[in-house]
Amino acid sequence: MKLVFLGPPGSGKGTIAKILSNELNYYHISTGDLFRTNIENDTPLGKEIKQIVENGQLVPDSITIKVVEDKINTIDNRDNFILDGFPRNINQAIELDRLLENIKIINFLINEKLLVKRLSGRRICQSCCKIFNIYTLPTKEKEICDFCQGILYQRKDDTKESLKIRLQEYNLQTKPLINFYSNSNRLNNIDASKNINEVQKNLMEIISKIEKKLV
């Protein structure tokens, strides 16, 4: 099944996608991971992406579509994967429909106040990249990783100022996708404000219902 996870930053769609990729052998395609790989490899696209992200803006369609299409073309099984963070707007959705058929959409619903709390509190270990949260998953020692004792840091785009810009961009560009997919009966909403186990359980129920309809 080809799944698209929609939802604002901090809605937990990336975490759930990784869980499904491990438990159900879905191939997880994260635009965030693709962007970071380009940045780490210091590619021409990576340099461009880095500047855009540090300014708290969304990466433009031309770059995003190319990065995602290139990745999809490397997958052997193109019938069983999750797209996380793509598409973000109608233009990208149209391009995705050109590339793939029978896409099903999971829309992660969560209120903005909880989003800001989740993201502004996020801290990442510089050494092992484990993720913590000063509000919901604090470390035993302040700013020190529980696993490797590495130093924690806050991403520049996780500050409250950057988050406001990111959420404004999301509301402006991505929310119209809800109508786009709803009109074609591909939209499935899920309450992402619950804990991760409940969200996973509800998602499995949705996937099961979709599979029954496809039989």
From Swiss-Prot:
Pathway: Purine metabolism; AMP biosynthesis via salvage pathway; AMP from ADP: step 1/1. Keywords: ATP-binding, Cytoplasm, Kinase, Metal-binding, Nucleotide biosynthesis, Nucleotide-binding, Transferase, Zinc. GO terms for biological process: AMP salvage. GO terms for molecular function: adenylate kinase activity; ATP binding; zinc ion binding. It catalyses: AMP + ATP = 2 ADP. GO terms for cellular component: cytoplasm. Residues 30-59 are annotated as: NMP. Pfam families: ADK, ADK_lid. AMP binds at T31, R36, Q57, L58, V59, G85, F86, P87, R88, Q92, R155, R166. It is an enzyme of class 2 (transferase). ATP binds at G10, S11, G12, K13, G14, T15, R122, I131, F132, K194. InterPro entries: Adenyl_kin_sub (IPR006259), Adenylat/UMP-CMP_kin (IPR000850), Adenylat_kinase_CS (IPR033690), Adenylate_kinase_lid-dom (IPR007862), P-loop_NTPase (IPR027417). It is found in: Cytoplasm. Its EC number is 2.7.4.3. Residues 121-158 are annotated as: LID. PROSITE patterns: ADENYLATE_KINASE. Zn(2+) binds at C125, C128, C145, C148. Consists of three domains, a large central CORE domain and two small peripheral domains, NMPbind and LID, which undergo movements during catalysis. The LID domain closes over the site of phosphoryl transfer upon ATP binding. Assembling and dissambling the active center during each catalytic cycle provides an effective means to prevent ATP hydrolysis. Some bacteria have evolved a zinc-coordinating structure that stabilizes the LID domain. Monomer. Belongs to the adenylate kinase family. Catalyzes the reversible transfer of the terminal phosphate group between ATP and AMP. Plays an important role in cellular energy homeostasis and in adenine nucleotide metabolism. This is Adenylate kinase.
